[in-house]
Every structure is written in C-alpha cells, then in structure tokens.
UniProtKB/Swiss-Prot annotation:
Keywords: Differentiation, Disulfide bond, Endosome, Glycoprotein, Manganese, Membrane, Metal-binding, Signal-anchor, Spermatogenesis, Transmembrane, Transmembrane helix. The keyword Membrane applies. GO terms for cellular component: Golgi apparatus; late endosome membrane. It is linked to Defects in GALNTL5 have been found in a patient with primary infertility due to asthenozoospermia. It is found in: Late endosome membrane. Residues 1-4 are cytoplasmic. Probable inactive glycosyltransferase required during spermatid development. May participate in protein loading into the acrosomes and accumulation of ubiquitin-proteasome systems around the head-tail coupling apparatus region. The lineage of its organism: Eukaryota, Metazoa, Chordata, Craniata, Vertebrata. The chain crosses the membrane at residues 5-27. This is Inactive polypeptide N-acetylgalactosaminyltransferase-like protein 5. Its cofactor is Mn(2+). Substrate binds at D174, R204, S228, W332. One of its GO terms (molecular function) is metal ion binding. Mainly expressed in testis. Weakly or not expressed in other tissues.
Length: 443
C-alpha cells in the first residue's frame, strides 16, 4: 500500500512537471513570436513625436518583393532574356517597333510584373538606411506610351518601394491619343489602392511642362521623376532619399541599367557619369578609378557634371527654390543640361548613386518629327545664352547656322541666375568639368 502511494505521488509530480514545462514553452514561444512580429513592422517615416534611433537593414533576405509574379514558361523566359525570338521578317514586330520604339510583343508576353536581376554591388547589400527618411512623390509623364510598359513601370515602383516612403505616384497624361490609355487605364488604376493620381492635360504640353504640372500637384518631401518605360530594381529609393536627407541641395540619379529595346533583356550598367561635349550632346563617360578609392569602393556616390534627365530625385522645396525647369523650353531636349548647369553653378551638387538601380528601355529612334527638332534647337539656344557666358562661342563654332536663330525672351531666367547668386561657367569648367575646357580646340 505504502509503495502504491509513493508511486502515485511520483507519477503525479512527474505529470505536473511535464505540463508545467509544456506551458512554459508555449508561453515563451508566443512571446517571442509576438516580439518578432512587432520588430518587423517598419517605423512610420517622419511620424510626429517619435524619436527614431533604429535602422532598417535591407539585406538580401529583407528586400521587398513583388506580391504577384507572372508565371511564364521556359520558352517565354528564353525569349525575354536571350532575345532568341527576334524575327527580323515579322511585319507585326516592325510595325510595333516603328510605333513604340521597342519590342511590344515581348513586353506584353511578360505581363506587368517580372523579376529582374539584382545588379547592385554586393557591398550595397551591407548598406544601412534610417527608418526615418523623406517621403517621395513619383512623377511619371507619358504621351502615347505603350500601356503595358506604363503598367510595368508603376508595378515595379509599388512592389519594390516601402509604402511608408511612397507618398504617391502622379501620372501626367500629355493628351495621349491611344485608346488603352483612357478608360482602360482608369479602370486598372484601381489595383494600385489609391496611391496613384492621374492628371490629364487638355492640350499637348511636352515633357518639360508636363513635369512641371505633375510637380505642382505633389505633396511628398522629394520629387522623383521617372520615364514611363522603366523598371526599378531592389532597394532603389532608399539610397536616393538618404543622400538627399543628408544634403538638401544634393540632386541624385540612380545608376541606369539598360533594358534592350528588342529583347527586353535587363542588362547591368557599369559605373559611369554624365557629361556632354561642345555640341551640347549628352553622353556617358567612365568613372575615374581614383574616384572609387576609399572604404566605400564601388558604392561611393559618383560626382556627375550632368544628368541624362529621365530619372532623378530632388527635394521638392529645392526644386522650386532653384527655378524648376525653364517653362519656356519646348517639348523635351537639353532641359537636362540646363538643370545640371544650374544645380552646380547655383550652389547645389549632382551625384549618381550606384546602390540605386533603375532599368530603362533604350527606345529605337526612328527619326524625330520636325516639331521636336525645332524644339530642341530652341532649347539649345536658351541654355547657351543664359549659362555659357563667353563660352557660347565654342557652341556656335560648331553650329554656326544657329547663331542668329531666335530663342524667345530669356530675361526671367537671366534674373533668376542673378537672384540665386550663381557662379560663372568658367567656375564650372575649373571645378566640375575641366575635361570640357581641355577639348576647346577639338572641332
């Protein structure tokens, strides 16, 4: 009897101990899971009354990924990545190439979302960005853009941009004539959950004034201008916002990867900087090796004499302060160089941020309409007469036929230059782009 009692007490204690241990494990697991869930929630950017010391790290496992990936066959992947499907005798393909400047057939087969290779340096994966950064308004202007390409641009932005940094996407339709960009576009914008505003111009304004219209409707701290046929890459926005947060007068561009116009293959860009020649033709130049010296290596921001203009970020108040775009320039062309000179000569800085990557379709040029050629000439001359000082003669030596062409009233822009206390073009050559002065005698 006594043995039975002792045995019962022993097994009872053992059972109690087991249940106690299981209860402890259960409670501990719930506590850890709850803490992990909370710790993964991003801190609201610029939220009032919060002191933020925590940093968000975007490594290879923490990069936001598209919520839907279009499934494709191996054949489709081969077509898009290797370009093996390009049929030079396909009349439909040539018709679309002439209309849109790139291979629309492959674009449509990809759907509106796809994964692109992460082309950043491995050192970029170790970069830390604060949880508290400025918010961004993305401005995308379009005119008769292929509908799927526009959706690919918007989808890549919404899928690969943290929602707490994305204030809004502002679409500016510059009076497109394509039916798909009317009711169909309005219908599909519902999928972007209210983050997208669309402005429809009542007359054709051209890219420059369309961007000014978009910027006037923005409410984010930073304006990010994107072309309507690009795809942003992973962790593309944070490096741009971080640079601007450190220096409000810094204007920044991503490193622009190439999306082939015929195969839509996404190709990484080498480290480059934007420059131009005395014909005012923009071009990409290699970066000097000594500029990449130091602990940051290939992730170091690249000092750039000029920007290509299609994709860049600038603090909204600074954009207004330095005079936005020259609103009397027409359509597009050379507004990028005018803004680049103004940034450098009027107290700002222009950098390319290698850890930010955006792919851009290099559309096939099939000849410019006479209206665009006329607009570019007009824009050339406004830039030359406002910003080049005595060096404008270098331009006219190469383009003598433009010396007596009219270019409108530039008084407002000349007064802006005086009001901002801008430096001379000689200063720009001495301090920003000495290689251009060295080429003075090369015609």
């Amino acid at each position: 009897m006594r043995n039975a009692i002792i045995q019962g007490l022993f097994y009872g204690s053992l059972t109690f101990g087991i249940w106690t241990a299981l209860l402890f494990i259960y409670l501990h697991h719930n506590h850890v899971s709850s803490w992990q869930k909370k710790s993964q929630e991003p801190l609201s950017a610029w939220s009032p009354g919060k002191k933020v010391h925590q940093q968000i790290i975007y490594g290879s496992e923490q990069i936001p990924k598209p919520h839907v990936i279009v499934k494709r066959t191996d054949e489709d992947k081969a077509k898009s990545m290797l370009g093996t499907d390009f049929n030079h005798t396909n009349p439909e393909l040539h018709k679309e190439l002439l209309k849109y400047g790139f291979n629309v057939i492959i674009s449509r087969s990809l759907g509106i979302e796809r994964e692109v290779p992460d082309t950043r340096s491995k050192m970029c994966l170790q970069k830390h960005y604060p949880a508290r950064l400025p918010t961004a308004s993305i401005v995308i202007c379009f005119y008769n853009e292929e509908c799927n390409a526009l959706f690919q641009t918007m989808s890549s932005v919404t899928n690969l941009t943290p929602h707490y940094f994305l204030e809004e996407i502002i679409l500016v339709d510059d009076m497109s004539k394509v039916d798909d960009l009317k009711e169909k576009l309005d219908y599909h914008l519902e999928t972007f959950r209210g983050k997208v505003k669309i402005i429809r111009n009542k007359k054709r304004e051209g890219l420059i004034r369309a961007r000014l219209i978009g910027a006037s409707h923005a409410s984010g701290d930073v304006l990010v201008f994107l072309d309507s046929h690009c795809e942003v890459n992973r962790v593309w926005l944070e490096p741009l916002l971080h640079a601007i947060a450190k220096d409000p007068k810094m204007v920044v561009c991503p490193l622009i990867d190439v999306i082939d116009d015929r195969t839509l293959e996404y190709k990484p860009s080498p480290l480059v900087r934007g420059t131009f020649d005395w014909n005012l033709q923009f071009k990409w130049d290699n970066v000097f090796s000594y500029e990449m010296d130091g602990p940051e290596g290939s992730t170091k921001p690249i000092r750039s004499p000029a920007m290509s203009g299609g994709i860049f970020a600038i603090r909204r108040h600074y954009f207004n302060e330095i005079g936005q775009y020259d609103k009397d320039m027409d359509f597009w062309g050379r507004e990028n160089l005018e803004l680049s000179l103004r940034i450098w000569m009027c107290g700002g800085q222009l950098f390319i941020i290698p850890c930010s990557r955006v792919g851009h379709i290099s559309k096939k040029q099939t000849g410019k309409p006479s209206t665009i050629i006329s607009a570019m000439t007009h824009n050339y001359l406004r830039l030359v007469h406002v910003w080049l000082d005595e060096y404008k003669e270098q331009f006219f030596l190469r383009k003598p036929g433009l010396k007596y062409v009219t270019y409108g009233n530039i008084r407002e822009r000349v007064e802006l230059r005086k009001r901002l206390g801008c430096k001379s073009f000689q200063w720009y050559l001495d301090n920003v782009f000495p290689e251009l002065e060295a080429s003075v005698n090369s015609l």
